[in-house]
Structures are given as C-alpha cells and as structure tokens.
C-alpha cells in the first residue's frame, strides 16, 4: 500500500467520533491495519471488543473523503503525519494504549531518526547523571533510566508560565548542562510562555534538538507571542500535536498535551511550578508512565 493511502486510513480511524486512542489501539491490535478496520463487519468489530454503540460509530463513518481532505490540507501546510509505527516511536510508547496512534507535526522529523547523522560520537562516555547528581536547585526531578551511554536522551523541562528571573536562569542553566552531559539530548517541552519557552530557546542556543508538544493543530501558534520561536523550533526540531490542522486552543487540550510530554520523556525537570500549577499534571503523568 502507498504511504498516502495508509495515512488516509489512519486519518479516517482517528477521526471517528467516539473512538479514542484506547479503542484505536484495540482495533489495530486485532485487525493490524486501519484499512482492515475500515472493511470489518459489525460482528468482527464486536468480537474485537468494541461496544455495540462504538461499533456503530465505525460502521457509520465509512467515508474516506474527509480523511483525504485533511491529508491534502496537511500537504499544503507543510505538516507531516507520523503513526505509532514510525521508527521515532519507541517500543515503550507503543505499549501505552492511551497515547495517539497518529500525530501531526511541523519541522524536521528526519533529525530524530535513529540513523540520523548528528556528527556526534556515540561511542564516547558521557557524564553519568544518576541520583548522586540530582540537581537540588530544581523543584522536582526524575529519570527513567541512567543517562550513561544513552543516545537521543529525551529530557523534559517544564514549569511555570509566570516564573521568576531565578527560575528562568535555573532553566537555561539546566538545559545547557544537559547538552554538556549528553550532546545528543533532545529537550522536550510544551511551547508555552515561561519555562517552556526558555527551555526551547536554550536548547536551540546550545545546539540541541527540541520538541514542542502543543494543544492546538501544529499550524496554530499558541501563544501568539511565540511565532518566531515556533519557526525556530521547526528548524531545530519538531512541533507535535495529536490535533489536526486548524484546531484551536481549548483548556481540555492542555492536560492531554502534558501526557505526551511525559510519555515521550526519559527524564523530567519541573522548575518553578506552584502547588496548583497545571505543570504538576505533567509530573503525575510521568510517574504513571515510568513506574
């Protein structure tokens, strides 16, 4: 099957109202491909574990026109599509059934390929960064595994939108240190004002790749003040979203964005987040995914 044809079926599957990531994962586990889901009978859908109401949603949605329109829109806007079978996805990510099976992005995904030539000697011994090196000046820090000899380490740096100058300096210093310890590190954040923006900017300044997970379509800049920053992120990394182009910012989208930051990260730093900060949901998701 041609790639565009495959993507059309993924767009169809992820666009079915009432069929979220958990059901999408279930269907793909049983039927293997979204095309097979498209052609499945009601009996087969029920046997796969779908409730009768959800099976009806699938059957009533059998029309690929909308999916083809979205694909064409993505091509015009320079948006790439990435399924959970892409090599950028780790095995650990594929095992989480509440994560999207399809994502939309802007930027340079080829820089995140395991085979990407970054001009870095991956045989060198980088600075070990275990518990004895825990940065005490940060509000919270945790890791999934030791940093030693770990190429393409994904490090989340998140925190308050309204942060102090001291928190800003902590953020910038931490990103710089991450790059010194591991020049192949990938800095992940949420593209928001405050710590998120400083983390992305510091990553770019220190020659690191960076990923911004957003709660809008990847073609939308939120906040608007970050238009220039988002352009830079697209040049030095990726902007990723589970939402199609044209999707506006809704409050409910940001906790969902936070779970992506947490799931994609091997290590996380939380800086300047208050007790009621939304950033703490990112920490909670990290603890969930990395138990």
Where are each of the predicted segments found?
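Short, small/acidic-rich helices and loops at N termini and domain boundaries
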Residues: 1-88, 127-134
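Glycine-biased, small-residue-rich flexible motifs in mid-sequence functional cores and linkers
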Residues: 1-5, 85-291
